[in-house]
Amino acid sequence: MAWKTLPIYLLLLLSVFVIQQVSSQDLSSCAGRCGEGYSRDATCNCDYNCQHYMECCPDFKRVCTAELSCKGRCFESFERGRECDCDAQCKKYDKCCPDYESFCAEVHNPTSPPSSKKAPPPSGASQTIKSTTKRSPKPPNKKKTKKVIESEEITEEHSVSENQESSSSSSSSSSSSTIRKIKSSKNSAANRELQKKLKVKDNKKNRTKKKPTPKPPVVDEAGSGLDNGDFKVTTPDTSTTQHNKVSTSPKITTAKPINPRPSLPPNSDTSKETSLTVNKETTVETKETTTTNKQTSTDGKEKTTSAKETQSIEKTSAKDLAPTSKVLAKPTPKAETTTKGPALTTPKEPTPTTPKEPASTTPKEPTPTTIKSAPTTPKEPAPTTTKSAPTTPKEPAPTTTKEPAPTTPKEPAPTTTKEPAPTTTKSAPTTPKEPAPTTPKKPAPTTPKEPAPTTPKEPTPTTPKEPAPTTKEPAPTTPKEPAPTAPKKPAPTTPKEPAPTTPKEPAPTTTKEPSPTTPKEPAPTTTKSAPTTTKEPAPTTTKSAPTTPKEPSPTTTKEPAPTTPKEPAPTTPKKPAPTTPKEPAPTTPKEPAPTTTKKPAPTTPKEPAPTTPKETAPTTPKKLTPTTPEKLAPTTPEKPAPTTPEELAPTTPEEPTPTTPEEPAPTTPKAAAPNTPKEPAPTTPKEPAPTTPKEPAPTTPKETAPTTPKGTAPTTLKEPAPTTPKKPAPKELAPTTTKEPTSTTSDKPAPTTPKGTAPTTPKEPAPTTPKEPAPTTPKGTAPTTLKEPAPTTPKKPAPKELAPTTTKGPTSTTSDKPAPTTPKETAPTTPKEPAPTTPKKPAPTTPETPPPTTSEVSTPTTTKEPTTIHKSPDESTPELSAEPTPKALENSPKEPGVPTTKTPAATKPEMTTTAKDKTTERDLRTTPETTTAAPKMTKETATTTEKTTESKITATTTQVTSTTTQDTTPFKITTLKTTTLAPKVTTTKKTITTTEIMNKPEETAKPKDRATNSKATTPKPQKPTKAPKKPTSTKKPKTMPRVRKPKTTPTPRKMTSTMPELNPTSRIAEAMLQTTTRPNQTPNSKLVEVNPKSEDAGGAEGETPHMLLRPHVFMPEVTPDMDYLPRVPNQGIIINPMLSDETNICNGKPVDGLTTLRNGTLVAFRGHYFWMLSPFSPPSPARRITEVWGIPSPIDTVFTRCNCEGKTFFFKDSQYWRFTNDIKDAGYPKPIFKGFGGLTGQIVAALSTAKYKNWPESVYFFKRGGSIQQYIYKQEPVQKCPGRRPALNYPVYGETTQVRRRRFERAIGPSQTHTIRIQYSPARLAYQDKGVLHNEVKVSILWRGLPNVVTSAISLPNIRKPDGYDYYAFSKDQYYNIDVPSRTARAITTRSGQTLSKVWYNCP
């Protein structure tokens, strides 16, 4: 049929072009142009996001919006001053527009449930879709044929609908509004449209069922998938053809993808597609709605993103669209849903369009996803893209958008391709379509998905081959989709993400993937089936399934898809995959699915998916994540399955095939991959590798890949670029896959991570992560995975990052060696053993890939990558290592892990980077940048998402992260985002499920890991190992580790940060926990165990210890920073991003306060962080003051009284807090004025002195401006302290102690003299009932030799001193030993090469 429809599509395309031209005749008016994609050639635009970019035609509002109707506005966020609202809360305030019930009520409420419900139906829908598929294409065609314009209009409507639906509509609001507007305007068609819309809506509903075809696809995520599938199916030929064409287009597509959403508008074909899509979407929407709901939450963010993205997309679309649109349109129809996304995308692409179409769908999905994810992804993507750079931009779509166009092209192709990959994923369906051509196309779609774009981007290149990926991805997506369906559960979650995402993406993906693939191939049925399956599984698994399916599917599918037959395979695979996944899913089911899927998906997707997956995954994950499933799933499945399922899924499919080869690889990958992927490129590599492999695999392997794909897919997806590597990639693939799997596995861990992830993810920051990865990885693996993501993110950027990561990884690499071990470990997890071997190999492969990846990542990465690569492998290894380590980490690290993630990522990355960096740095830098971007983006996105989603997302994020991780990897962002998301959920869920399953497996695995590596156990040791490993890396490693550790935290933080932060704070504990969690992630049990550990560690204090060890272990250098972060886990994290430096206590900046707690712990405070210092290990990871101490930061100063109680006082502005060790006393804060006899002014440092003979206990307040005031405590009877504080040998005692001691003794005489002075104080003893505040005097008057600028001061317990203390004051980079009795201060000169931070903080 596809072939038959091809001509039609072509005709449609022609007509579309014509129409487009026609419609473009009057470019200064929106008449007939409402919702059309963005075009740089137009003087003004009418896409639904034009307002965001202030590029709307003057009559846009009049022509394209309806003030009193909810048509297309269901997902827009609330805005003041409107006559009526259509957001989910309007009912609460009784301000809903009159037609709210008919347009949005269902979406907002039932949706959720429906979602679930629907989700399942989607299965049915899928079937329907199947029909639909056929039908869809037709209608679209018909429609399209009818009139592009009309179509367009319709599309618009649909678009609107869809948009609205999509709302993911991210555009949602924008779109919605726009849509609404457009609708209204729509040409006056508004009415018609309205009717139509209503009709559509009904149709949608009905259609969904009925049209289901289109809708169904949409409908369920599966629908979406279907949709994708559908059109995909239809599209297939066209698509394929187009795809092929598109392929090229892809480039464009990519851009388009962005458009995707907008694409919708593009309409024409989009329209048709849209219709379908819409329907689909609608359904989806419903489902999606749930999603939406979810999405809605997301919405905001999504919206934003969406909007942005949409706009971008739209814009892109528009411009792209136009042509593309047309083209697309035709194909689109097929894709219809896809179109939508794709359309846009396609449009751009034109040919791609078709493919795009899928994209469309995807887009759509993506959009939502994007949106949702988008936010995550998009944003992320951007970053990711960034990574991809081109893509990213594009991805950013929003950013890209604009960029896209250009970018797109440029990128597009790649992007598309790449994207495709992702898209593919999404596209997958497309892929099917794609199948072969599709692939390209697919990519395109992918692009749309793009969101995935980012990934896609990567993939895109891959794209062609990607297709497989795509498929794969889609699969993931699909799963996702299904997930969505399943999501159902997730739905909400999923929905949100998934749904939208999923649906959109997933659906598309799934469907698409499967569908497309299948359908296309098996054609619809299959598709349907596939989708269904996917979906189905999804439903079943629902989350799980979907996810799983997704993954597996994706993998499989993907794989298949590419293959086409594959497709069927996909289907089957898919199915199986799903099944497996499902299985996993079942296990986790939810979890699993996600997990599996996610993981895998992510994995698969991840890479590709990443984008998509990411999206999807993210979405799903996200969703899922929330679901955790993913996480869980991953965790669980992953773990268990994870290995099996997840792995399974991915692995399975992947593994299976891949497995064999890959498998090991995967395994390895997993181990390695994770490691590698994770680590190395982890992200990049991963990605790249994966990608490459993937690609290659897919492409070549594709088939094989399929298997691999799955793994590969992920990989593939992931890497398209890898494509190049492709070959290697395959190998890589495995890794990738593995990775993925690994990831997955890792993921699992990742999940853990995710959970942790969140942290980790944040960690993600992957870059760091990578670095961390190793360490983290282990733990991290999950983390790593996550990490990966981070890396991923970086990955993309990362690639570069990757490299860095890799670098990191390299460090890891160093580890690498270990890695193998680790891998083993990791592998253990998966193949564990083999993995190791393989992994190792893979790793290499990866590296290899990485290079490709790098390529992909392109060169930047590449260059780096190479290193990375090497590293990568190493990294991989490291990763593994890391993983193990992580494990350990996890254990210990757990926190660290988290931290690690976190920090590393952000901070570390940089930092790490730094260390590693340098190499990495470059990379990193890039990465960072990228990362940053990504992270940033991510963060942003994440944040957004996070925010919105946050809770959900968080979970998701995590998941995503995981996914992301995987995915992210591709996108860092996503990851982040994901992470963020996931974490939350993940954590929870994950923990749970994971725990269970994960635990088990993981545990097992882990244990295995552990055992294997010991790592887990060892982890810690591992750490060391790692360290060594790292060390191997050399310092870097160290850093890495350190990073890792921090990374965990940091990153997450970072990304998470946002989220975490959010969460973190709350989470902090959680974070810690989470961190722990992350570890958790890894093994839940472990987690638990870890957790505990972590927790302990996590616990601030406990954490410290734990941390300390761990951090110290490798933290030295970075540690500070990282440690810092880790310490803070969440907190630190945040900073992390930029902070790298802020969280690095060893950067030479003076601290705000340094004190010893009553229990002898030496604590340094600077900015928003604090570090626990130990004489024998590097500083702990930075932790947030606010999260642990509960006081606002930064503080002005801190001091601990030199008496038996040893209370610690914090000063901030005009208030002070009193703590007993780290427990805040009741009744604080209190005004400084009242507590210290009228003390006022800006306090910069405080030195507490002990009571000795006639000297009263007092405290000297150094104030801004060089003055000092002494406050003498009310005198109390002399008492012997029952158990004196523990005598600790502080680092500073090393060198100057003796001299000081002699000095002190010599000074005793004067002391007495002083005593007399002080006698004054004694005189004051009269005021025994209260303390006395002396007048302000210049510092130099009170103490000779002390500079006017004192930044901090400390009383160190020293049992060898007469009064039991040594007193020090710090001024910039110099410190002084203060002799209280003689009132003199002597500057301490450190031995050559020693710095103040080395002496005091034991910095490396």
From Swiss-Prot:
Biased composition (Basic residues): 132-146, 1026-1047
Cleavage, annotated site positions: R1306, A1307
Pfam families in UniProt: Hemopexin, Somatomedin_B
Post-translational modification: N-glycosylated. O-glycosylated; contains glycosaminoglycan chondroitin sulfate and keratan sulfate. O-glycosylated with sialylated oligosaccharides which are predominantly represented by the monosialylated core type I structure, NeuNAcalpha2-3Galbeta1-3GalNAc, with smaller amounts of disialylated O-glycans.
Biological process, per Gene Ontology: immune response
Any one annotated GO CC term: collagen-containing extracellular matrix
Segments forming domain SMB: 26-69, 66-108
Superkingdom: Eukaryota
Biased composition (Polar residues): 235-252, 266-276, 1073-1085
Region 59 X 8 AA repeats of K-X-P-X-P-T-T-X, annotated ranges: 348-855
Assembly with partners or alone: Homodimer; disulfide-linked.
Function: Plays a role in boundary lubrication within articulating joints. Prevents protein deposition onto cartilage from synovial fluid by controlling adhesion-dependent synovial growth and inhibiting the adhesion of synovial cells to the cartilage surface.
Protein's recorded name: Proteoglycan 4
Organism per entry: Homo sapiens
Gene transcribed to yield this protein: PRG4
